Curated annotation (Swiss-Prot):
Record function comment: Probable GTPase-activating protein (GAP) for Arf family proteins. Involved in Golgi apparatus organization by targeting Arf1 to the Golgi, which may be important for membrane trafficking during epithelial morphogenesis. Regulates the positioning of interommatidial precursor cells during compound eye morphogenesis together with Arf6 and Cindr. Required for cleavage furrow ingression in early embryonic cells.
Domain PH: from-to ranges: 310-404
Gene3D superfamilies, per the entry: 1.25.40.950, Ankyrin repeat-containing domain, Arf GTPase activating protein, Arfaptin homology (AH) domain/BAR domain, Pleckstrin-homology domain (PH domain)/Phosphotyrosine-binding domain (PTB), SH3 Domains
Protein name: ArfGAP with SH3 domain, ANK repeat and PH domain-containing protein
Biological source species: Drosophila melanogaster
């Protein structure tokens, strides 16, 4: 039964009963009711506190406005007194006396108003202010804190005695489940009396406060009523007394007006007589009503020039000099240029002419001179005279035409005509924003009426009433524009596309409760609420204890590209310009966001730019150290260095200083020119020319829903939300459900720089059952690592923007989980490298319980030992968020299998982001000196290699189980946990890396996380070239057709001559660990040998679902090119006799023929 309220009389009766007879009292049973009652009373006091605060504000506003009214009335009194005194001096005593009488009445009424304002201050505001500063001071819960302490002491003592009684009963061999309060009444008497005393004290204070806020406040309001009544009575008495004089004054004014009308008629008659005189000479310069209405007044329609005269002209004109002594006409040569200027030459034409900008001039004809015209500039007028009237019209027409042309050109340059596709993109983005959760109503008041106003820096939609309050806050708090009236550019919509009203209110109104605005709220209420929400941030839930926590969360938000987390830290007061905690180079969140921006996190960059202090845009990193390549780089320097053109647009449009220099004394423009980033160079040049229209539109992956259902996309151009159910499982390990994914959802293909898709969902990986998961706590986003596709794109187009991928959720790692992984791998090593049937029996339950994880990069280590020469190449990436476990654990894993000789080469680094020698702090910006991946360059740390799948297939449960056991693969998978798939590209247009990353080892190849067999060929899908080893001096090979030769006896890799692989498109070689005859000799000296191609017959008709699948009919003969693909239920082959028909086919559709 829930506790109920206890009345004061009941409390007194229960307390007296307990005081007289503690053992028979029932007070202990009513103590929960007392606590509940105190809580309810505290809520009522909080409501009274809020009500009195608002009452005080209202009374204070009335008092201030009333005093202002009194002051203005006194100004009026003094003006009337001066006016009356002046009229009396002009022999008009009646009118002067009336002015003075009005001043006296106004003064008396003003005195009454002043008395009323004093009364409202003394009678109402002073008592209310006293209550708020005495009884109701502090915050909710302050007054009942002594009661809470007494209740806590009572409960602690009761629990202690209860434990003692139960222990005594247990020693006596009895079981005591409950302790009666009467049994411990005597022992608890002190605590119970204190509880009763504090309750009594609280009730006394409560009654005193309710008396003051109720009865006494109403008595004060009664006094105010009497004061108000006296004010109106005295005022009415003054007005009535003045009313008698008003009647007399009206009669006097009527008489005075009649006399003035007689005088006016006499003057009019006299004027008529004078004008009728025959020999009267009229004076032309006397203005009449007609001349005032016409003439050289302002004309709405300006001069129109004759287009036949063109926009250029030169010749001689007479110009009137501006001398102080004498003004003469001087003949000067003049020239009108097509760019909107008039050049006036001097008498000595060798001097440079005076140039007048026609855009700031006005051309006017001279009414009295048909050959003359005036040119009015911003600082002086020019008076010209042509040879004749025709010449004058020609000059004026040319001047007007040239001015119109310059004006049209200026308007077109300021707002260039956008292409229809760009206009459609704007409309589509706006429609998408309006459909976001919560955007159908005002973010602040919930109104559905005219929700067409957007706050650009918050990305929310508000109604027209709330938009006015946002404007009052100032642009440093909220930048308001209209979706319908303003021409919003795509750069204005970046934050709005990623935010939404619901997302913002979940954070900014987390502690609001029931006090939200309503659509019928007044403007005063809107102002108070919106200011408290956005300026004071009063309703934000605090999640960080200090500034260091805020800085850590800020860095995490940028790393994860998490807009909600970024908004949270901003709302909690984080300094967006502070140095990040893990940076030794002094990088801010903006530096990190720019470095990690690959095309899909521009909203993070824009939010930082728009909501940080202006000085943060130009904040530079620390000066360069002894081992650093460069230092003192601003965000604009990093954009120029790494070709972040879209980030540069956002920075330049917000006013970033492009003239700042780094430690190498280079500006961003110098760096862009040096690096060959022409797009960045052009953007900075536009900023220098003040051509800000170049920054209006952003090229990014908007990730908008496709409204045209007929549009056909290939598999690697579509992204399906990983959270939705799938029709077939993907071809990589892990997943939400092994049977609910379609292969088209595996958006792990390596996108080229022109790919429209950037937001691929985060990948999921699994370890064998019993192996604990671990991920690095940096909360990795794929922006942390540069994808192979971006490198392939950068080989031909340095300025290409590689697409980004969505961030994955962060999680923490522990050394225990790493050691558990090592132990599990040791067990697998003892079992050997081949897979038994039991390995394939992983339960579906285990697969469904898998968690998302990312593979951390191994820490730096020393490579090249004779017993373990396996080391992994890596793509360049900022290392400081990825090394979260001990190097000893990784070395123990890598060195477990002594017979492995696999060496994975490193992709050549194109202006790669290197790790700072300081060990995890900051970002260096040099070029890697180890393109061959030998491990002996500047970046010789042990890093994970990019693992690729050449074919996106939908495996059965068996192959999925096979891929799930990638325990050791976490050391070679990409740090972001992605398994990218190659996209079909034009090989002739690409410069390939020297040694691309290896393909994924299957479970049969895994032993202690490393491969003990030859690496299978990398499948590109439609293309299946053979592989052969050539000298390293050859050109870069095709990335999709890479083979490495391994020695099963542990001979190791020959480092003296690093190998490269060239490719052709005829057929494909394959090596199998089960057939040693297919592998060559030890080391690099051995070649791959192929003993023959297997053939199979089609059992059924097969229709291709994807462009890389083979379509065939029943009975056709297929030649197998590759038996071992990333999905063991699929092979690659061609139709016999038809080599153009090539692709992947399911094993279950064919019957293998004997060799």
């Amino acid at each position: 039964m829930p506790p109920s309220l206890i009345a004061v009389s009941e409390f007194v009766e229960e307390t007296r009963s307990d005081y007289s007879s503690p053992t028979t009292s029932t007070f202990a049973s009513r103590m929960p009711d007392c606590r509940h009652t105190i809580g309810v009373l505290e809520e009522r006091l909080e409501f009274d506190r809020e009500g009195l605060t608002k009452l005080k504000k209202a009374v204070k506003a009335i008092h201030n406005s009333g005093n202002t009214h009194v002051d203005n009335e006194m100004f009026m009194v003094r003006a009337l007194e001066r006016l009356g005194g002046k009229v009396i001096e002009q022999d008009e005593p009646d009118i002067g006396a009336a002015f003075l009488k009005f001043s006296v009445v106004t003064k008396e009424l003003s005195a009454l108003m002043k008395t009323l304002m004093q009364n409202i201050n003394n009678i109402v505001m002073f008592p209310v202010d006293s209550m708020l500063k005495s009884e109701l001071r502090g915050v909710k819960g302050d007054m009942k804190r002594p009661f809470d302490k007494a209740a806590k002491d009572y409960e602690a003592k009761f629990i202690k005695i209860e434990k003692e009684k139960k222990a005594q009963a247990k020693e006596a061999g009895m079981v005591r489940t409950e302790i009666d309060a009467a049994v411990v009444a005597e022992e608890m008497e002190k605590e119970r009396r204190l509880y009763q005393l504090q309750t009594c004290e609280y009730l006394l204070k409560y009654k005193d406060i309710k008396t003051k806020t109720g009865i006494e406040l109403l008595q004060h309001l009664i006094e105010y009523y009497h004061a108000l009544s006296n004010y109106f009575k005295d005022g009415l008495q003054t007005i009535e007394h003045f009313g008698t004089y008003i009647g007399d004054l009206s009669e006097k004014l009527h008489e005075i007006k009649q006399k003035q009308d007689e005088d006016r008629r006499s003057l009019l008659d006299l004027r008529t007589v004078l004008r009728s005189t025959p020999d009267f000479e009229r004076v032309d310069n006397v203005p009449s009503s007609e001349s005032r209405s016409g003439g050289a007044g302002y004309s709405l329609h300006q001069l129109q020039g004759d287009k036949h005269h063109g926009v250029t002209r030169q010749g001689h004109l007479l110009k009137k000099s501006e001398g102080k002594v004498r003004r003469v006409w001087q003949k000067r040569r003049c020239r009108v240029t097509s760019d909107g200027f008039l050049d006036i030459f001097h008498a000595d034409e060798s001097k440079p002419p005076t140039r007048v900008n026609l855009l700031t001039c006005q051309i006017k004809p001279v009414p009295d001179d048909k050959r003359g015209f005036d040119l009015i500039s911003y600082n002086r007028p020019y008076h010209f005279q042509a040879e004749d009237e025709g010449d004058q019209k020609a000059w004026m027409a040319v001047l007007v035409n040239c001015k119109e042309k310059a004006l049209t050109k200026a308007f077109q340059h300021a707002n260039p005509q956008m292409s229809p596709s760009l206009v459609e993109l704007q409309k589509t983005v706006i429609r998408y924003v309006q459909l976001l959760p919560g955007n159908d109503r005002c973010c602040d008041c919930g109104s559905r009426n005219d929700v067409t106003w957007i706050s650009l820096n918050f990305g929310i939609l508000v109604c027209i009433q709330c938009s006015g309050v946002h404007r009052d806050l100032g642009v440093h708090h909220s930048r308001i524009q209209s979706l319908t009236l303003d021409n919003l550019t795509t750069a204005n919509l970046l934050i709005a596309r990623a935010m939404g009203n619901s997302t913002l209110n979940d954070i900014m109104e987390a502690k609001l409760g029931r006090g939200k605005l309503q659509h019928e709220s007044s403007m005063e209420e809107r102002y108070d609420f919106i200011r408290a929400k956005y300026v004071a941030k009063r309703y934000v839930m605090r999640t960080c204890s200090d500034d260091n926590d805020l800085r850590c969360d800020l860095e995490q938000a940028v790393v994860n590209a998490d807009m909600s987390q970024l908004l949270q830290v901003w709302a909690e007061g984080a300094d967006l310009t502070c140095c990040l905690p893990s940076s030794d180079a002094g990088e801010t969140a903006l530096h990190l966001a720019v470095l990690r921006e690959m095309g899909s996190t521009l909203h993070i960059v824009d939010f930082l730019i728009q909501n940080m202090p202006p000085k943060g845009l130009n904040k530079a990193t620390n000066p360069a150290g002894l081992l650093d390549v460069t230092g003192k780089n601003t965000a604009l320097h990093l954009c120029a260095l790494h070709d972040r053109r879209e980030c540069m647009k956002l920075l330049l449009r917000s006013g970033a200083d492009y003239e700042l220099k780094n430690s190498q004394n280079k500006t961003a423009l110098d760096i862009a020119k040096e690096m060959g980033h022409n797009s960045c160079r052009e953007l900075i040049e536009c900023a220098i020319k003040r051509e800000k229209s170049a920054f209006d539109h952003i090229n990014t992956d908007w990730n908008l829903p496709n409204e045209d259902g007929s549009t056909d996309f290939s598999d690697d151009e579509t992204v399906i939300d990983e959270r939705k159910s799938r029709s077939r499982p993907p071809s990589f390990a892990g997943g939400d459900s092994p049977v609910l994914r379609s292969r088209s959802s595996t958006c792990d293909s390596i996108q080229s720089s022109s790919s429209p898709i950037a937001n691929c969902p985060s990948r999921q990986f699994t370890l064998p059952s019993g192996l604990p998961s671990y991920t690095h706590s940096a909360g990795t986003s794929p922006k942390q690592h540069i994808s192979v596709g971006q490198y392939l794109g950068s080989a031909t187009n340095v300025g290409g923007n590689g697409p980004g991928n969505g961030g994955s959720s962060p999680s923490s790692a522990s050394s225990q989980s790493v050691r558990a992984a090592r132990n599990s791998l040791n067990m697998q090593s003892d079992l050997g490298g081949h897979v038994t049937g039991a390995r394939k029996s992983t339960s579906t339950a285990n697969m469904n319980s898998l968690k998302k994880r990312t593979a951390p990069a191994p820490p730096p280590g020393t490579l090249g030992s004779a017993s373990s020469s396996s080391f992994y190449g890596t793509l360049p990436h900022p290392p400081r968020h990825s090394q979260n476990f001990d190097a000893s654990d990784i070395r123990a894993i890598n060195h477990k299998n002594q017979s492995l000789d696999v060496a994975y080469g490193t992709l050549p680094h194109l202006r790669s982001v290197e790790s700072s020698p300081r060990g995890g702090g900051g970002y260096g910006y040099g070029v890697s000196q180890d393109p061959g991946g030998s491990g002996n360059g500047s970046n010789n740390s042990l890093m994970p290699a990019m693992t690729t799948f050449g074919h996106k297939r939908s495996p059965s449960g068996e192959s999925l189980n096979r891929n799930i056991h990638l325990a050791g693969a976490k050391l070679v998978l990409p740090p972001t946990g992605e398994l990218p798939t190659l996209k079909h590209v034009d090989k002739s247009a690409l410069t390939r890396p020297k040694i691309p990353p290896p393909g994924p080892p299957s479970e049969r190849e895994i032993s202690n996380g490393q491969s003990n067999e030859s690496i299978s060929s990398m499948d590109e899908g439609p293309v299946a070239p053979p592989r052969k080893l050539v000298n390293q001096s050859a050109n870069f090979p095709d990335y999709e057709s890479w083979h490495t030769d391994m020695d099963s006896s542990g001979g190791g890799l020959d480092h003296s001559a690093e190998s490269n692989v060239s490719s052709s498109d005829n057929d494909r070689l394959n090596s199998s660990p089960d057939n040693p005859s297919k592998t060559g000799g030890a080391g690099l000296g051995g070649k791959f040998h192929y003993n023959g191609q297997r053939r199979c017959r089609a059992l059924y008709d097969c229709v291709a679902d994807n462009d890389d699948e083979l379509e065939f009919k029943e009975g056709e003969i297929l030649i197998v090119l590759n038996e071992r693909t990333d999905d063991e239920n699929w092979m690659e082959g061609i139709i016999e006799g038809q080599p153009t028909r090539k692709g992947m086919f399911p094993v279950s559709f064919v019957h293998m023929l004997p060799d």
